[in-house]
Amino acid sequence: MPRLQIVVDYILEQIRKRNVDEIETNVYRRGTPSEYNRTRQFQQAWKADKSTISGNTASGKFHYDPDSMEYDADEAQHGSTNPAWGDAREYLAELIYNGASGPKYGDGYWTQRRDAWEGLIRDIDGEDIVKWTRQGFAQAGLTVTKNRG
């Protein structure tokens, strides 16, 4: 694997780990469901794909993968027990992050915004990116030097 790919993969993995923390804080710790058992599949549905190299460009993708979760209508897992609404995996992040919930379960923490994405973007700063880049370079066996000019 080209060394620059190792660096990009390392950075993406750090973003994925930080996202796990943000979902824990902003989604799961905000309340405990009483109508279903939490699977934590939503937290694990965010993927850092392996990077690719094209010419002199390395790129990677961090994304939500709704198909990695299971839908169980009987248990209201990742969707509704109401057949008219059904499987919500495709837009579950939007529902959770915007506090968009139907009237079936009344008011509660699930009707409040629990936006882990906004938290992730706010939490990652330039220092994190620089630190992760340096760590990724070290993991790839590359030396970073500053040329002051």
List PLM regions with ranges:
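Non-globular disordered terminal and juxtamembrane segments underlying protein topogenesis/assembly
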Residues: 7-27, 60, 129
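Charged, low-complexity interaction tracts
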Residues: 30-149
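N-terminal, Lys/Arg- and Ser/Thr-rich interaction peptides
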Residues: 1-6
